[in-house]
C-alpha cells in the first residue's frame, strides 16, 4: 500500500473506486483529455473500472491530488516503471478549474521524491504534445530538460501528436 504524502497545499493519496465521480470530472472533460493518450471517458462507470487497475504493481505509482483546504480531489498522477525500456516516466492530469496554479508540479515533485528514495531512481522521463504548453511548463519546473522530438498516438489510434521527450538525471 502506498503511503499518504503531503505537500504545502495537497494531500497525495491512493485513488479508490469511490473516487470515480470526482475523477470523471477530468477524465470525461475534452479540455483535459485533448492531449491524453487514452480516449475520452464517456461515463463514470468506465472510470470506476479504470480505478480498479491502479496501484496493482509497486512500480506503477498513482496518487490522487487532494486540496488540503477543501478536501476536494482535483487530479491524479504518478511515476511508472517501463520494464521493456528500463525507464521511469511521469504522467498526470488535473481538473480544468485547477490548471495554472502549480498543483501538478507540487504533486509530481513529491511523488518523484518518494519513488526516487524507494527505488533508487537515477533518471526520469516525460513526454508531452508540443502544443501542450502547460505540460511543458510542469516538466521544466521539475528540472527536466529537452531530450528529443518524438510522437505518440492515442490508444485507439484516433490521433497522433508531435511531441517532445524530456529527461531529468538525479
Where are the predicted features?
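A short helix-loop-beta-strand connector motif used in the catalytic cores of GNAT acetyltransferases and
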Residues: 52-64
